């Protein structure tokens, strides 16, 4: 997706006191003074006053509904998404407040919004906090939905709609918290550290027109030192009644490969003594399926296992990589637990052959390989060769997408602020760092030298398995208790981090 960016990407920056427009590297001061809410170009004053009077939870529910109804569907093509509509909505949301706003548009319609509340002394204060949200959502099969996927319908304190879980509720919460910090700054109570909110485009397509594009082409547009994004806050219920709340501290990497498999050409009527590429492909496939791939034995995996409160034998075997079972002990998280503890190899695409009477001499097999922290591309290729044994002499490995896994330390001020807020919210619960099998924009922050955590607060008590099952699902929905809880805990984390330098 990175190759979709067209030359001359449009970048627009708006600063509340002296608006600027930046186009193709040129900076032009616009002859419009700083406007308060209700003045031309800045949205109606009544809306801003009404939003200030609402609770943080009410504001977030309202904004979430509006984002869902936009339907910024990303079908993995450059012209989909239309996230500029969300950028327009959110820019109006901050109207009249002392923030700087930059619009970054690598491709028409694919706008990411960067909103900054400056700290009291940004030149000397601690590292800023960056909130990485995204406004695009995955497509829907409307025939499989029982409600309008873009209607943001509320029933029994639950909102239904595409993106409610992934991740518009958190994006809305980030906007509301940033707005509240800006409102306080307007009243003379600026935070010690700066706060940056990003409403990014194109996350669902790995961000070729979103945060990864910004990191590659405009890394100066936002600080990468300390970031929060999606997928934390769900619960793990232990077998002895314990409660743990997860914080995502890392993500698996991608090491996609195409194997070129050589065979013997010949006429299909005389196969004796020849091995076609199709037959050899089947042998390669079987060898890969039978192989043992690297497993996790680090403390992040160990803390995840301990949260389930298994018997001592099961716990020890899982932690030390000697487990031989099917992960059924994890129940609805069996596939999740296996994925975050292994280098996984999914055989996804195979090609070979032409006329039915010709034995082909070439076949390809594509592998979607997801790696653990510390496993690099050379390790992956070596593991493939080892798995193939003698078959390796007939195979050439082509590297496709290559991204190392990323992980952040938990010995940081930001993690401690998250831990304190979550244990206050859920008395008696433990906070458990976990690796996530998928990807998010946090990988960009980590690769640029920062730390990043997947954050949330699930007041409904939904388990990690229940939350995970909602991702990209038909009839995606979220309990409004979780929306309110997320914004309230995020506000506490931000307040703690921004005021303690």
Where are these regions (language model features)?
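Zn-dependent metallopeptidase/amidohydrolase metal-coordination segment
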Residues: 401-402, 428-500
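Acidic-enriched catalytic cores of C-N bond-cleaving enzymes acting on peptides and small amides
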Residues: 219-220, 226, 233-242, 248-256, ...
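Active-site-adjacent substrate-binding region
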Residues: 285-293, 315-318, 409-459
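Acidic, glycine-rich active-site loops and adjacent beta-strand->loop/helix elements
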Residues: 135-137, 199-207, 230-235, 265, ...
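Short, Lys/Arg-enriched N-terminal segments with co-localized hydrophobic residues
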Residues: 35-50
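Active-site metal-coordination/substrate-binding segment of hydrolases
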Residues: 125-196, 478
């Amino acid at each position: 997706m990175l190759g979709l960016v067209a030359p001359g990407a449009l970048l627009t920056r708006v600063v509340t006191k002296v608006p600027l427009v930046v186009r193709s590297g040129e900076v032009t001061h616009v002859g419009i003074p700083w406007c308060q809410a209700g003045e031309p170009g800045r949205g109606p004053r009544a809306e801003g006053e009404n939003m200030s009077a609402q609770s943080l939870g009410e504001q977030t529910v309202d904004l979430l509904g509006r984002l869902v109804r936009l339907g910024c569907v990303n079908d993995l093509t450059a012209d989909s998404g239309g996230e500029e509509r969300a950028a327009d909505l959110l820019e109006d949301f901050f109207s009249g407040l002392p923030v700087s706003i930059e619009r970054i548009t690598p491709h028409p319609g694919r706008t990411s919004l960067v909103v900054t509340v400056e700290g009291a002394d940004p030149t000397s204060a601690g590292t800023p906090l960056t909130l990485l949200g995204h406004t695009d959502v995955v497509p829907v099969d409307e025939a499989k939905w029982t409600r309008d996927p873009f209607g943001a319908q509320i029933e029994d304190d639950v909102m239904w709609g595409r993106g409610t879980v992934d991740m518009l509720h958190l994006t809305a919460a980030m906007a509301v918290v940033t707005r509240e910090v800006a409102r306080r700054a307007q009243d003379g109570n600026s935070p010690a550290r700066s706060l940056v909110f990003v409403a990014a485009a194109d996350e669902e397509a790995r961000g070729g027109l979103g945060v990864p594009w910004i990191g590659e082409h405009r890394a100066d547009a936002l600080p990468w030192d300390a970031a929060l994004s999606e997928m934390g806050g769900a619960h793990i219920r232990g077998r002895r009644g314990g409660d743990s709340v997860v914080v995502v501290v890392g993500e698996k990497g991608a090491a996609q490969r195409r194997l070129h498999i050589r065979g013997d050409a010949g006429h299909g009527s005389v196969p004796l003594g020849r091995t076609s590429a199709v037959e050899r492909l089947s042998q390669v496939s079987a060898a890969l399926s039978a192989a043992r791939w690297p497993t996790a034995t680090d403390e992040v995996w160990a803390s995840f296992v301990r949260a389930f409160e298994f018997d001592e034998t099961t716990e020890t075997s899982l932690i030390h990589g000697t487990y031989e079972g099917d992960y059924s002990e994890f129940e609805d998280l069996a596939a999740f637990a296996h994925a975050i503890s292994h280098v996984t190899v999914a055989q996804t695409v195979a090609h070979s052959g032409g006329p039915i009477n010709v034995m082909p001499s070439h076949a390809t097999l594509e592998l979607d390989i997801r790696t653990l922290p510390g496993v690099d591309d050379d390790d992956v290729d070596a593991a493939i060769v080892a798995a193939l044994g003698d078959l390796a002499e007939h195979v050439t490995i082509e590297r496709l997408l290559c991204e190392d896994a990323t992980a952040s330390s938990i010995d940081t001020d930001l993690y401690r602020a998250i831990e304190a807020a979550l244990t206050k919210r859920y008395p008696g619960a433990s906070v458990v760092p976990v690796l996530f099998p998928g990807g998010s924009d946090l990988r960009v922050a980590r690769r640029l030298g920062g730390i990043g955590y997947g954050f949330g607060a699930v007041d409904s008590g939904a388990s990690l398995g229940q939350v995970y099952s909602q991702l990209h699902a038909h009839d995606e929905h979220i309990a409004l208790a979780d929306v309110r809880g997320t914004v309230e805990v995020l506000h506490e984390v931000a307040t703690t981090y921004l005021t303690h330098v």
